[in-house]
């Protein structure tokens, strides 16, 4: 885990404009460890990665999708007795849980996919897998989601698909695709990734009720935040590009997106019959 921390810090310092030798000196002073400037260069250039020597995480589009989905609907759990470190997803849609479980298995080097299980208490499909390295990475990302950028920016479409499967929706009446979250850091990260594939959006704030009522028990809970952020994608070209590059794994959301595109086509036919 220490090497991952060095990797994150090295990339952060490089983005701040420091040279490789200077980064090596800073890391030596801060972490009391010696790291060759050449190794730092290989990290920055993407030639090497500290996780590639471990079988715990396999980088690729599946990892980007897993992280994107987890940022929206995921949790972490640890079983101290068995030393299991679980990455979990709890969702309403089976097709989302199924795809996330397949990708999590691929990330972990597992041949068989993780299978979603229905939990009556949650009224959700739950899928989980034990992966200590991914658990550690996501735990640190709670404090600073930007440390995930090196894993996501090579596969921005898959990362966004995971996040939109978790938090996204289609608003046909307003001709928009939207994603909602209370954490401005996650919304900004999503915006960065969308722009990498040429999809542009705007961010709006709105207030929500302080209390949340559980539909099953009727109990009321205090929300963590009274402000929710909406990232909105609109405009025909943006919507079409989103549909082509990103889309949804969830069938009901993909159907809504298809209907929105058809509305655009009908509107265009009325203007140019």
Show where each model-derived region lies.
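Internal intein/HINT superfamily modules and their associated LAGLIDADG
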Residues: 1-273
């Amino acid at each position: 885990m220490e090497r991952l921390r060095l990797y994150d810090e090295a990339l952060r310092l490089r983005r701040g404009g420091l040279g490789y030798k200077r980064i090596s000196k800073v890391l030596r002073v801060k972490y009391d460890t010696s790291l060759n400037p050449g190794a730092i260069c290989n990290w920055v250039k993407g030639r090497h990665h500290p996780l590639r020597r471990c079988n715990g995480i396999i980088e690729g589009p599946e990892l980007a999708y897993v992280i994107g989905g987890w940022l929206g609907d995921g949790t972490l759990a640890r079983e101290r007795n068995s030393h299991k470190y679980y990455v979990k997803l709890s969702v309403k849609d089976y097709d989302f849980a199924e795809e996330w479980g397949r990708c999590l298995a691929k990330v972990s080097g597992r041949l068989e996919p993780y299978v979603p299980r229905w939990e009556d208490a949650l009224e959700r499909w739950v899928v989980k897998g034990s992966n200590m390295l991914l658990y550690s990475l996501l735990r640190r990302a709670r404090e600073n989601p930007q440390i995930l950028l090196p894993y996501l920016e090579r596969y921005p479409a898959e990362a966004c698909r995971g996040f939109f499967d978790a938090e996204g929706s289609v608003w046909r009446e307003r001709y928009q695709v939207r994603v909602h979250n209370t954490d401005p850091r996650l919304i900004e990260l999503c915006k960065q990734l969308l722009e990498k594939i040429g999809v542009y959006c705007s961010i709006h704030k709105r207030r929500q009720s302080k209390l949340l009522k559980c539909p099953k028990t009727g109990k009321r809970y205090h929300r963590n935040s009274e402000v929710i952020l909406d990232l909105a994608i609109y405009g025909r070209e943006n919507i079409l590009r989103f549909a082509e590059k990103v889309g949804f794994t969830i069938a009901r959301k993909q159907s809504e997106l298809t209907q929105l595109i058809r509305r655009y086509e009908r509107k265009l036919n009325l203007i140019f019959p």
